[in-house]
């Protein structure tokens, strides 16, 4: 196995192991997690097919950074992730705890990130592998945590199910758009206005830290039965405590 392939997949494997360990209650079946990973591969293939079809009919979104960020990445990628996720896990009987939505979503997103990483690193080399391991793959992980969080809210909360379902798409799309916009805009202006590009990159780094903070709060501070807020160290709210 080549070094580049190992570097491409190492952050994906590391984050998959991390989220699997964080599932401290009822571990999800490995077969279902494999389906989620393969679903992410399916998302990557679908995105490639979609944009190849658009190019064939003369439609291009590679015009300005915000259009490329939204229409070329955030919207199609996160929407397809959501649709594949619903298809694979929504009616599955193993989807029975709040944290499950986060586990499924992250595995699917990491499947996508793995394919994307291999393609980028194959063309860009070790420098790209290191950069994407620090930023791009964790970003897909963060988007997935937020998507899984709202997906579980839609499944387990008794009210506002459609609203939480909408948020499961809208919030990851927004976060993904902002992430790509700061990065693409800074690259676009790097030779035109270096000081502006530097400020954008600084904003990008701060946004990356914010994503991590948002994701970790979603992972640690929700009841496993219904998704209600709980105190640190607890696993269930008073309404969902298992019978002794």
For the regions a protein language model found, what residue spans apply to each?
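Hydrophobic alpha-helical segments at protein termini of multi-pass membrane proteins
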Residues: 1-244
């Amino acid at each position: 196995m080549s070094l580049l392939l190992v570097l491409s997949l190492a952050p994906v494997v590391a984050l998959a192991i991390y989220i699997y360990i964080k599932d401290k209650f009822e571990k999800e079946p490995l077969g279902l997690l494999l389906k989620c990973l393969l679903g992410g591969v399916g998302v990557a293939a679908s995105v490639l097919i979609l944009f190849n079809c658009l190019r064939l009919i003369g439609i291009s979104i590679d015009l300005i950074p915000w259009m490329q960020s939204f229409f070329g990445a955030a919207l199609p990628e996160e929407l397809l992730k959501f649709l594949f996720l619903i298809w694979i896990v929504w009616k599955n009987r193993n989807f029975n705890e709040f944290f499950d939505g986060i586990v499924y979503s992250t595995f699917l997103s990491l499947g996508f990130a793995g394919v994307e990483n291999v393609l980028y690193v194959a063309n860009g080399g070790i420098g790209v592998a290191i950069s994407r391991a620090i930023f791009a793959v964790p970003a897909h992980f963060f988007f997935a945590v937020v998507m899984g969080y709202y997906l579980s809210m839609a499944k387990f909360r008794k009210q506002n199910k459609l609203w939480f379902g909408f948020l499961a798409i809208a919030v990851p799309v927004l976060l993904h758009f902002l992430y790509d916009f700061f990065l693409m805009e800074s690259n676009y202006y790097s030779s035109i206005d270096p000081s502006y590009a530097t400020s954008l990159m600084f904003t990008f780094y701060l946004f990356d830290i914010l994503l991590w903070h948002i994701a970790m709060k979603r992972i640690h501070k929700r009841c496993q039965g219904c998704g209600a807020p709980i105190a640190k160290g607890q696993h269930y709210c008073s309404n969902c405590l298992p019978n002794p």
